[in-house]
Amino acid sequence: TNNSDWMPPAIKFLAEHPNDSEYVLWFIRKLERLASYLLVTAQDVNHRVDRYKWLLVEMESRSDSTLADPLRNIELTDWEKEHFRQTLDGEIYTMTAQRRNYIIQRLDSFMSDGGASYNQKLFTIEHVLPQHPPVHGSWLELWPDEQERKYWLNRIANLVPLTRQRNSAAQNYGFATKKEKYFQSKGGTSSYVLTTQVINEPVWTPDVVKKRQAMLSEVFAEKWELNPSRQSGTDEGLFLLAGRGSSAMGYPIDKDCFLVLK
């Protein structure tokens, strides 16, 4: 990301737990998820600082935390998880290049188990269903409903990563030609799992895109653990805010309000 707000808790944690490799790995994964949430949902610097402060306050009061009884404020609340999921399910392509590139690359790395590499200078994101499909051609036959086209156009299911310069002429090719001449490398493959999946689709219809969107949303939910966790009558999913002899437990109900439960 273009900020370093995550560094103070990372440095503090590594200094306090230098010999607990399993707990360090757990913490880094949770911190990456928190940092990703703050980036993807475009939180401003004040909100980011406040959010990390909640974590640092707990770290100060619980320097003896362990993997058996880990830090809690590094977890996303149910409200944050839902906010994260809704953002990821939205119009990714309309975001800033930094945010949309990160989302696509992170998703592709999830699908490839982290084995992919990304050339930032050549990395581009392209639409499968074109932004401006030609009046005469197969695209409007497959996608006759203008509102449906607009709804799915910029969502993640309709986007593929490429490592090549944009080709404005190729963007409006029919699906079969686009796959062969634009999405594939000279060897007939792609270095990205997301693009390979699209290449393997025989047609690109609204039903295909809907199913793909649901599948990709579940990948995010699984890898970033975005399913709800808070249960009525339990402490699951709550924040513990403690410091200077006082503490409170609760959770954010939106980005500005914190509900204190006890």
Predicted segments with their positions:
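Flexible coil/loop and intrinsically disordered segments
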Residues: 1-242, 247-255, 260
